[in-house]
Amino acid sequence: MPLFSHRFTTASSSSPASPSYYNKPSSKTHKPNSSSSSYTSSRIHVAIIFFSLVSVFIGVAGTIFALSSTGPASVYRCGGSKDTSRVVSASRKLGGDGGNNGVVVERRKLLGFVGIQTGFDSGDRRTALRSTWFPSDPDSLLRLEQATGLAFRFVIGKSKDAKKMAELEKEIKEYRDFVLLDTEEEYIRLPYKTLAFFKAAFKLFEADYYVKADDDIYLRPDRLATLLANERLHSQTYIGCMKKGPVITDPKLKWYEKQGNLIGNEYFLHAYGPIYVLSAEIVASLAAARNGSLRMFNNEDVTIGSWMLAMDVHHEDNRALCDPHCSPKSIAVWDIPKCSGLCDPESRLKELHKTDMCSKSPTLPPDDIDQ
């Protein structure tokens, strides 16, 4: 509009080119030629209309070009993973490797995406979670996302068992709170599932942080959001309860590490597996990694820790992510060190939720609020 106004003002404030006899001194008074003046005025109006139409055309054409040429943010594809809680909006079809039927999805912007790792035999755990801290229906899921900036989904692979898949489909239709991964759901393949999770999460959500959590912990979403909202100097940050420990090389023991000879006698610093956080820059690197290019150890938490050693990441140790009891500062509660999660999650989740300290205490401790 300023462009049009400028041209109109310029045209109307300057006089039309005068015939030469207007400027010649004469003893006679000459009347302006009315037909010539009208003709000149008409030409000015035509010029104004022409330039206005051209400007409008250029503006519309530019808008159409921008909309057609600008796709969504770069997305790393990951098999056939999909988010069941929303209708995926697509802007462009790609011939590709199958994610969402070859469609690039629009990534939702978030503070954090939290993937609750679950399995086909964990239906009772999911029921217990939905009756405690995890939202029990799609509307509640959306309200929690709006309140905290965190999106929560159960994350599960696929099974060759048709009955298990049919039962899962029923649960999906009822709750719509899953991310489905295009990988086999097997305990011995947890490192592969974890990598598939981060790739899928990065494809579906544009988050500042990506959280891996197990389905047997009690979590305070509000406090997790507060933790993630803290300012950090490092763009590559790895947050969790950090630990070291002896490498288990005895095949008869639970945490046996087949490639222990590559590690030595003691594990490097890494986060406990029940919950940890990776910043967006780290996950972007994992999403871009070629399949088969990352070493996989037997244990998922060790595998992630080894990848972190290969990157220039900052290890942020936060014990509120592994609190054995609910406290004014606890974010995640689980039975450390007895179990890698709650020892009896179906019962313990409900017991903890009935405790005011777990479910009703303020997001911030009183001393922090006063400050």
Curated annotation (Swiss-Prot):
Keywords: Glycoprotein, Glycosyltransferase, Golgi apparatus, Manganese, Membrane, Signal-anchor, Transferase, Transmembrane, Transmembrane helix. It is found in: Golgi apparatus membrane. Its EC number is 2.4.1.-. One of its GO terms (molecular function) is hexosyltransferase activity. One of its GO terms (biological process) is protein glycosylation. Pathway: Protein modification; protein glycosylation. InterPro entries: Glyco_trans_31. The keyword Protein biosynthesis does not apply. Residues 11-36 have a biased composition (Low complexity). It is a single-pass type II membrane protein. Its cofactor is Mn(2+). Glycans are attached at N291. The keyword Metal-binding does not apply. GO terms for cellular component: Golgi apparatus; Golgi membrane. Residues 1-36 are annotated as: Disordered. It is an enzyme of class 2 (transferase). The chain crosses the membrane at residues 46-66. Pfam families: Galactosyl_T. Beta-1,3-galactosyltransferase that transfers galactose from UDP-galactose to substrates with a terminal glycosyl residue. Belongs to the glycosyltransferase 31 family. This is Probable beta-1,3-galactosyltransferase 12.
